[in-house]
């Protein structure tokens, strides 16, 4: 069974990465690790250089309740040079952010739109992103 695991790292502490790595190191299926915290992605890659990791990102406001440092690092995407994510999952509602522009034109790694919940949102994103993360919705065009 393929797994997509989001590391919830609300501060600069990356201690949980070791525990997740220990739990997954013998897993035989495919697994993607993603997080809003680029420090956690970097730590996980140090533990498992073959892991596929993704940076969750978007433009943040105070209501997002994210640690201010983590919000800055994540939204700017500038630390991607250190964390080296294999993909970015970006909040398509805030893709006018400077960090998104930089990623598209400088880092050139695959970008997935999150989280798409309607047909209208799907139509908006389908040609602008490399992939789409859906929630409680699957477009009729791609149902097998």
Model-derived segments and their meaning:
Residues 1-3, 7-144:
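Short loop-to-alpha-helix "cap/lid" segments that border enzyme active sites
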